[in-house]
Amino acid sequence: MKLHVRNRKCIRHISFRNMKAAKTRNIIAILAISLTAILFTSIFTVAMSIVYGYEQSNFRQAGGYSHGHFKFLTKEQAEELREDPLIKEWGMRRFLGVPYDAPFQKSHVEISYVDENYAKWCFLEPVKGRLPKEGTNEAAADTTVLALLGIEPEIGAEFTMTFDVDGTETTETFTLCGYWDFDQVSPANHVLLPESRVQEILTKTNWQGLDGMTGFYSL
C-alpha cells in the first residue's frame, strides 16, 4: 500500500520539531556512530601495521623479498633463466668470497657483485652514495663492516680487506662509494663490488670454482 502525502511541508516541520526536542539524544547518537567508525578504522590500521611489520621482519631475516631465488648458477644458466618469459623481473648476484681473520671472526661478511634490482630486493641499497661503477675499485658496504675496519662512513674513504676466494687468500683495497645501516636481523654483512672487479680478483686468484659457490651467479 502506498500513501500519497500532499502536505510535505507540514511533515517536514513536524520532523524538525521532533529533532529539536531530542537534540541531546541525536548528538549522542551521532557521536556514537562517529566514535564507532573511528574505532574500527583504528583497529584495521593497527592490524595492517602489525601484518606489514611481521612480513618485513620475515623478509629481512630471509635476506630478501623476491618471489623466488636460484643460487649458484653458471653464467649460461643465469642468462637462460633471465630470458624465460615467465620471469617478469630479475636481479643478479655474483659471489666472490668471505673474510675469516680479524676483525671478522665473529661476523659473517659476504663480498660479491649485485645489480640494482638485487640490491633493492635484498635491502642492500646505499642510503648514502651509490652502488659501485664498473671498471673501478669502488665498493659499497654496510656500516658494521666499516666499523669493524675502523673506517668512518665517508664517501671516498679507502679501506683494505683480506678475504678468502675459493681457498685462496687475497688482500684488496677499495674506495667507498656508498653505505647503508646494517639490519640486526639480516643473516649476513655485505661488501658490494662491480662485476669487473669481481672478475679481476677471480682471475688473479686462479679461480677454479671448486667450492660450487665462488664465482657463480644467483638470480
Outline where the language-model segments fall:
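Generic secondary-structure boundary/loop-capping signal
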Residues: 11, 37, 41, 121-124, ...
